[in-house]
Amino acid sequence: MMLYRIVMRRYLASTWTGYGAETYGGRWNHKGHAAIYLASSVSLAMLETLVHIQDSSTLSEFELFQIEIEDSNIMLLQPQDWPTNWRSDPAPATTMDIGTEWLESESSLGLLVPSTLVPTENNLLLNPRHKSFQTCLSSVQPLSFAFDPRLK
């Protein structure tokens, strides 16, 4: 599966560490647990980035990466396992509990979860502590990218 990640240039050094999610937490992980959030398409990666941008003058400061994760290394979070409040804002503890438990189990390299912005599309949590993590990094490629300046 091809996946995508958009990163602000000043954070390029930590792109594949899980530092941001570990420091601040995320929808599918508690603080203190490293995770790397990826999107299943470039357009979804853009939406997932734009929803967090507070200053549109920073739109020119991002880079796009593509990574390939073998389907056999991905676990799908089944819809029947989604908490009823999974789309709540701020993110509920129920979703953080699910992702954190998965991270700690190291049962797969990736966990496919629904996007709250586009529920019919998926994001993937990548576990930087999984035994296959370093191997998958060899597939990372930077892609040419720029947000359209009309986006604000």
Swiss-Prot record:
tRNA-binding listed as a keyword: no
Report the Pfam families cross-referenced here. RES
Q: Which GO terms describe its molecular function?
A: nucleotidyltransferase activity
Keywords assigned by UniProt?
NAD, Nucleotidyltransferase, Toxin-antitoxin system, Transferase
Keyword check for Protein biosynthesis: no
Q: Which domain of life is it from?
A: Bacteria
Q: What is its EC number?
A: 2.4.2.-
Q: Kindly report, in one word, the top-level EC class recorded for this enzyme.
A: transferase
Q: What does the sequence similarity comment in the record state about its family?
A: Belongs to the MbcT/ParT/Res family.
What is the stated purpose of this protein?
Toxic component of a type II toxin-antitoxin (TA) system. Expression in E.coli inhibits cell growth; bacteriostasis is neutralized by expression of cognate antitoxin Xre. Probably depletes intracellular NAD(+).
Q: How does it assemble?
A: Homodimer. Forms a complex with cognate antitoxin Xre.
Q: What is this protein called?
A: Toxin Res
Q: Which gene encodes it?
A: res
